[in-house]
Amino acid sequence: MFKTHKVEIEWAGRPLTIETGRVARQADGAVVATYGETVVLATVVSAKAPKPDQDFFPLTVNYQEKTYAVGKIPGGYFKRESRPSENETLISRLIDRPIRPLFVDDYKNDTQVIVSVIQHDLENNPDILSMIAASAALTLSGIPFMGPIAGARVGYCNGHYVLNPTLDEMPESKLDLVVAGTENAVLMVESEAHELSEEVMLGAITFGQKGFQPVIDAIIQLAEVAAKEPREFIPEDFSDLEKTMLKMIEKDLRKAYTITDKQQRYDAIDAIKTEILSKFAPEMEVNCELTADKIATVFKRLQAKIVRWNILDTGKRIDGRDLSTVRPIQSEVGILPRTHGSALFTRGETQALVVATLGTSEDEQYVDLLTGVCKETFLLHYNFPPFSVGETGRLSSPGRREIGHGKLAWRAIHPMLPTKEAFPYTIRVVSEITESNGSSSMATVCGTSLALMDAGVPLARPVAGIAMGLIKEGERFVILSDILGDEDHLGDMDFKVAGTKNGITSLQMDIKIDGITEDIMKIALEQAKDGRNHILNEMAKALTDARTELSEFSPRIEMMTIPVEKIREVIGSGGKVIREIVEQTGAKINIEDDGTIKIASPDTKSIETAKSWIHSIVDEPEVGTIYQGTVVKTTEFGAFINFFGSHDGLVHISQLASKRVAKTTDVVKEGDKVWVQLMGFDERGKIRLSMKVVDQQTGKEIPQDDLIKTEKEQNPDEKNKSEKKRHNRKKED
């Protein structure tokens, strides 16, 4: 019934199996891939023809994690998987980016890749396996895909690269780098690093590319026996139309691309496009094969060619800069003084308004992954409203691009954050892109660094980011620093690098062509380092270090630790005690299972009150220490005082005051607040207290000499009796 084909290799110490022909046989391509005991199903289906007037390639990649893969039932009311999580969206992008450039030019058939995680061994991350499975399914499908590609994860532990580290090994790694590419070229890199050098990062890319070669060989081996016949696809020839249009618009288009203002430049280009359409209008009426869409397609190609020729021939860019110059930078902090931290970072025509907010453990985000639920204390949200590029548009929930750009900035900042113990706050950063002309994600990195320091978050070092570009024609190439939007769209590479003065914290690279050599990447990294250091120097004009004091509007959090066995006493029966502390002090209190307590409040006094209250519950009173207490009962022989939480002790009538006391109620009454010193314990372990040794106004201990003097002054009868006794003893002698 099944005609299955399978290849199996040993890869990084674990078996990798790619199988086709058993599952999802009606898809154009379907693969079940297994790595260790993690299993994914990848399918691809492409329409037989493009939709009419389709002017782009509609590729959709959906990555989905099934909870049954780890023996779980989904939460929520409906108990089924719903909209993609942030993690699923990010992995969908991770798969999309290296495969998209490999579809043949002008292929516009609706294409969908679906990758499902159907088993997870909690050891091998399914993202790399999903990329491999998608590549294999495309290679087998007969769709015009110039693959295969493969990917690998690279770690860096103890000065050595590690291929495909397991989930347990990743916390020890200073690098989390994913690289994907073909047999001969790197197409995509994404990473988070702990201030690693350019040499280490480049070495990791090369190490990863070599590491995934056996996988490409395995996919080719499977395709030789299981691939479908290639679909016939002949790209439309626009060469004659291109030559004709180039003669008509080259001069005007070159002139338009010397206009430095983005909106003015776009207006000039739109005018040229409108004019060329009007010139071809008579011909379009008689030639049904010549359409406005074809003219628009050729016009876009000519735009790319002219921009590229200008840069390669003159070394000058669209806005007049040379190849390595960064646009003018303006950094401002504290522009929204009632927020916890804020910054406005402007670089040329790209601008980010970034705001940091500090919260408590109640604000932590719970992230439900296949590997378990974790709590995220650093959130970074990137928003790209349509007005930032002078357009109208629909405002909705964040799209894939916004989620991806936010995560890129998150990776850049995350290694520089203080530990949870050193800074026990939940941090949320929102980056509002208010203007955009390229590199908005890197503006977010710079703005986030400034906003966090303005909020008083003690970053290890400031972080900056820069986007690099590439124009390559044959053997000629140039590397561009701080690329514009047009240079991104019309160039061959988008290479984003973020880091500190000490090294790289995040790197993301997307390459649209083959032939990017190690030397080109090395030049790009070195040029990016110079640009990054320049940006850091410009940022330092606004703020160099984190503010030493938090905003007056920020919550204050203090931590204390109690013995685990005392947690029950602090919480109380049914939470009675902890609720009373919260209600009386106004502080928020969070108790961890290990005995760590976080106390949060905008008011320092309420924090101190809550801390003292908790100390009174878990600590034992010490002899010689002064405490404030409440009189709970009076008797003929003294008063009982409740102090230091639930502790009770007796102040004997002789210890109520320095003078002789006839009745206890002459000095204290029930409900009075008094200061007492713990004198010790009687033979039955009962607490002995004294009021007379403490100044009841200040709560300070009275010096012994002063106490004796006061007693003599306030008890003259007792003094006379003592002198009479001494006189009688002398007479007897």
From Swiss-Prot:
EC nos: 2.7.7.8
* Keyword annotations: Cytoplasm, Magnesium, Metal-binding, Nucleotidyltransferase, RNA-binding, Transferase
- Which top EC class applies here? transferase
Domain named KH: residues? 555-614
Quote the biased-composition stretches of kind Basic residues, using this chain's numbering: 722-733
Q: Name one GO molecular function term.
A: RNA binding
Main localization is cytoplasm
> Using the chain's own numbering, where are the disulfide bonds?
none
Cofactor(s) this protein requires = Mg(2+)
Annotated ranges, domain S1 motif: 624-692
Region ranges (Disordered): 698-733
Q: Which SUPFAM superfamilies match?
A: Eukaryotic type KH-domain (KH-domain type I), Nucleic acid-binding proteins, Ribonuclease PH domain 2-like, Ribosomal protein S5 domain 2-like
**Which stretches are tagged as biased composition: Basic and acidic residues?**
702-721
Q: List the Gene3D superfamilies.
A: GHMP Kinase, N-terminal domain (3.30.230.70), K Homology domain, type 1 (3.30.1370.10), Nucleic acid-binding proteins (2.40.50.140)
The GO annotation for biological process reads: mRNA catabolic process; RNA processing
Q: Please state which protein family the record places this protein in.
A: Belongs to the polyribonucleotide nucleotidyltransferase family.
Q: What is this protein called?
A: Polyribonucleotide nucleotidyltransferase
